[in-house]
């Protein structure tokens, strides 16, 4: 493994445990501990533990911080409170998604933005440049934080045993600061990237190995990036760099709920997003399920039954839950019809698929 790759505080723990390490977004990360299927199914039926310390953390603070945060982000940041986080997008002037992220308000005019690992430097530079017009400071604090995710139907009961607050009623994106977890001070967020109940835990970077070891003493399955990807795909959750990019808008990506272009406040990309909200976007993201044998992979072309290309695959895998090959595709809006049969070009073969819901695990 190259010494140039960044490493989380848990890297040595993973090497010692025999986890398979791969490069991801410039980081040396575990792709699996046992098998992807085993880890995936543990999260769907019981619970799994992920190291997500590679994610970036950026602080925005100052007397004008709230105005800067709203100017940068596509959602209505007035709805962000010291107990309620928000999923949102960092957009360019064309409405394209520079990154998708979560915003936490730590106190008045102090915000924590959690961004994708491979985009941290790019995001920071973009925010730093835009902040020059505001009385606000942008600080990259990524090295100070560790982040763990406990996910699965049994996650809440486990977390409750070791925290000093009641988590039984915590709803998605609610969070609490200064929570004691295995004796360490953490931010506890009811969030995740699997489609299951669970929590993301922000801790001091130095505390991450201790917390990892303590959690694993409770019959929790350690999980790698492989299961994280299959889990998020079953749930229809997008990945930046594949399903989201600087040339794809929130309306095209299926995350319109993260864009609020009708609010009074201005933000970058607002005019384009307002037009797409009022008039529709030319493309949309759909779920696909393969009818014939073959796994849809990123970049594979999608055609209608008349042979016209209507889009391409952005993500795909074989679902460990159902055994079916599934994917997400960005297609022309006028080609969309739920249940419609399409053709995916899998190498030299044309393979039939059908349009389905993106979230394939929703009850």
Swiss-Prot record:
Keyword Transmembrane: no
Mitochondrion is among the record's keywords: no
UniProt GO BP: glycine decarboxylation via glycine cleavage system
Enzyme Commission (EC) number: 2.1.2.10
MF terms in GO: aminomethyltransferase activity; transaminase activity
Catalytic activity: N(6)-[(R)-S(8)-aminomethyldihydrolipoyl]-L-lysyl-[protein] + (6S)-5,6,7,8-tetrahydrofolate = N(6)-[(R)-dihydrolipoyl]-L-lysyl-[protein] + (6R)-5,10-methylene-5,6,7,8-tetrahydrofolate + NH4(+)
Physiological role: The glycine cleavage system catalyzes the degradation of glycine.
Listed name of the protein: Aminomethyltransferase
Underlying gene: gcvT
């Amino acid at each position: 493994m190259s010494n140039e790759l960044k490493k989380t505080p848990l890297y040595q723990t993973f090497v010692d445990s025999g986890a398979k390490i791969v490069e991801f977004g410039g980081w040396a990360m575990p792709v699996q501990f046992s098998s992807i299927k085993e880890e995936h199914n543990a999260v769907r039926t019981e619970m799994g533990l992920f190291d997500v310390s590679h994610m970036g953390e950026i602080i925005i603070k100052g007397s004008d911080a709230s105005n800067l945060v709203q100017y940068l982000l596509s959602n209505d940041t007035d709805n962000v409170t010291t107990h309620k986080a928000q999923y949102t997008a960092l957009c360019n002037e064309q409405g394209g998604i520079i990154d998708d992220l979560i915003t936490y308000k730590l106190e008045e005019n102090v915000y924590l933005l959690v961004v994708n690992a491979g985009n941290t430097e790019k995001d920071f530079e973009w925010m730093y440049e835009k902040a020059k017009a505001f009385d606000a400071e942008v600080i990259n604090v990524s090295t100070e934080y560790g982040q763990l995710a406990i996910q699965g139907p049994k996650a809440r009961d486990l977390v409750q045993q070791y925290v000093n607050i009641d988590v039984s009623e915590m709803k998605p994106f609610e969070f609490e600061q200064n929570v004691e977890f295995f004796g360490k001070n953490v931010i506890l967020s009811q969030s995740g990237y699997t489609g299951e109940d669970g929590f993301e835990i922000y801790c001091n970077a130095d505390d991450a190995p201790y917390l990892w070891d303590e959690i694993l003493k409770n019959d929790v399955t350690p999980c790698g990036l492989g299961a994280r990807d299959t889990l998020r795909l079953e749930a229809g959750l997008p990945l930046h760099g594949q399903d989201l990019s600087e040339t794809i808008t929130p309306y095209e990506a299926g995350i319109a709920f993260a864009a609020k272009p009708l609010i009074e406040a201005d933000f970058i990309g607002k005019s384009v997003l307002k037009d797409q909200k009022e008039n529709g976007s030319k493309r949309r993201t759909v779920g696909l399920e393969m009818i014939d044998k073959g796994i849809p992979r990123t970049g594979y072309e999608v055609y209608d039954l008349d042979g016209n290309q209507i889009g391409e695959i952005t993500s795909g895998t074989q679902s460990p839950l159902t055994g079916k090959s599934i994917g997400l595709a960005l297609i022309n809006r006028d080609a969309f019809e739920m249940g419609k049969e399409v053709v995916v070009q899998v190498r030299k073969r044309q393979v039939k698929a059908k349009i389905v819901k993106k979230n394939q695990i929703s009850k």
